[in-house]
């Protein structure tokens, strides 16, 4: 499970021999998990699980979404048996709001602009981004970039605003990915 999960989810994970991950180590944790078992339940963020599995070379067809509100997660027995990763039908409300159209609009306005996104963004957003990384990775990547670069950042607004302030003296322009704002209630 994810580090920001509730204590009861962490306990559930521990009880069944699972492990807790962060966005920076999710791929390594999945590798460890597959060394223990042939199938992984990744929760609660489906997008982080999907992107991490994809980075490992697991085909999207080998990942299914488990909806806890439906009998058998809304899946057939065959889908469950065939899946390598079962993704819990959950997501971060902040990262969920970013859309591919935000990236397309940015690229049309700033062809030399660079897009960096958190792996909790949708698969489509991640695929269209130049870089994908944890919060710390986003900070390091933008700070290490050459001066006078323009960035579209797909993560929490306060982090983006702080980063923009930190690098503006280098001529870097950092902007929030979404045109609408949803503040994260858990950060």
What are these regions (language model features)?
Residues 1-187:
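The feature marks the mature, well-folded catalytic cores of soluble enzymes
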């Amino acid at each position: 499970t994810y580090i920001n999960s509730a204590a009861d989810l962490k306990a559930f994970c521990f009880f069944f021999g699972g492990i807790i991950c962060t966005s920076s180590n999710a791929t390594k944790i999945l590798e460890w998990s597959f060394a223990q078992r042939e199938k992984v339940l990744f929760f609660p963020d489906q997008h982080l699980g999907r992107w991490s599995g994809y980075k490992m070379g697991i085909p999207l067809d080998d990942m299914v979404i488990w909806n806890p509100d439906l009998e058998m997660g809304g899946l057939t027995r065959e889908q469950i048996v065939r899946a390598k990763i079962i993704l819990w039908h959950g997501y971060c409300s902040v990262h969920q709001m970013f859309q591919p159209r935000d990236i397309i609009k940015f690229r049309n306005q700033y062809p030399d602009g660079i897009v960096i996104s958190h792996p909790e963004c949708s698969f489509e957003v991640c695929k269209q981004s130049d870089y994908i990384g944890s919060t710390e990775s986003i900070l390091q990547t933008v700070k290490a970039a050459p001066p006078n670069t323009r960035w579209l950042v797909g993560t929490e607004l306060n982090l983006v605003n702080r980063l923009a302030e930190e690098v503006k003296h280098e001529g870097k322009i950092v902007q929030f990915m979404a045109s609408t704002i949803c503040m994260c209630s858990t950060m």
